[in-house]
Curated annotation (Swiss-Prot):
NDH shuttles electrons from NAD(P)H:plastoquinone, via FMN and iron-sulfur (Fe-S) centers, to quinones in the photosynthetic chain and possibly in a chloroplast respiratory chain. The immediate electron acceptor for the enzyme in this species is believed to be plastoquinone. Couples the redox reaction to proton translocation, and thus conserves the redox energy in a proton gradient. One of its GO terms (molecular function) is NADH dehydrogenase (ubiquinone) activity. Belongs to the complex I subunit 6 family. It catalyses: a plastoquinone + NADH + (n+1) H(+)(in) = a plastoquinol + NAD(+) + n H(+)(out); a plastoquinone + NADPH + (n+1) H(+)(in) = a plastoquinol + NADP(+) + n H(+)(out). InterPro entries: NAD(P)H-Q_Oxidoreduct_6 (IPR050290), NADH_UbQ/plastoQ_OxRdtase_su6 (IPR001457), Nuo/plastoQ_OxRdtase_6_NuoJ (IPR042106). It comes from Lepidium virginicum (Virginia pepperweed). This is NAD(P)H-quinone oxidoreductase subunit 6, chloroplastic. It is a multi-pass membrane protein.
Length: 176
């Protein structure tokens, strides 16, 4: 950010003190849930420091990956492991599980048949790819966005499907 010197210094000291307080909270708080939330605050302050140093894409990646995914995973694991009571009436198979597995299997086979029957060499991702890349793009974020939406579109979408399946699996494990 292009800020005047005193404002930049104030924000730097404010975020640094937030990092110190959050780090002390991670180490000193006795409840692991509060420690995990404090870790999320530390990671959020780090992303704000990236914004302060004009690294906007790194800040967005920090928020999405570390605060949004890793910290949520840590909180999920802590909450899952703190449950000392185990359910004694655990049903291995219910009607809902059968319906869900039937729907998921149908979707899987329809996706597999679509993927195998499609001629991927004939697909034109975009007609203006060379024109877009020849332009002077303003930032690295725009270049990454162009490559994700053209060259790496299919792997990007496959990763999003894998993450969706992992999220659904985590929710189903947490509900049991």
């Amino acid at each position: 950010m292009d800020l005047p010197g005193p404002i930049h210094d104030f924000l730097l000291v404010f975020l640094g003190s937030g990092l110190l307080v959050g780090g002390l909270g991670v180490v000193l708080l006795p409840n692991p849930i509060f420690s995990a939330f404090s870790l999320g605050f530390v990671l959020f302050c780090i992303s704000l420091l990236y914004i302060l140093s004009n690294s906007h894409f790194v800040a967005a990646a920090q928020l999405l990956i570390y605060v949004g995914a890793i910290n949520v995973l840590i909180i999920f694991a802590v909450m899952f492991m703190n449950d000392s009571e185990y359910s004694t009436d655990f049903n291995l198979w219910t009607v809902g599980n059968g319906i869900t597995s039937l729907v998921c299997t149908t979707i899987l086979f329809s996706l597999l048949s679509t993927i195998l029957d499609t001629s991927w060499y004939g697909v034109i991702w975009t007609t203006r790819l060379n024109q877009i890349l020849e332009q002077d793009l303003i930032s690295n974020s725009q270049q990454i966005g162009i490559h994700l939406s053209t060259d790496f579109f299919l792997p990007f979408e496959l990763i999003s499907i894998i993450l969706l399946v992992a999220l659904i699996g985590a929710i189903s494990v947490a509900r049991q």
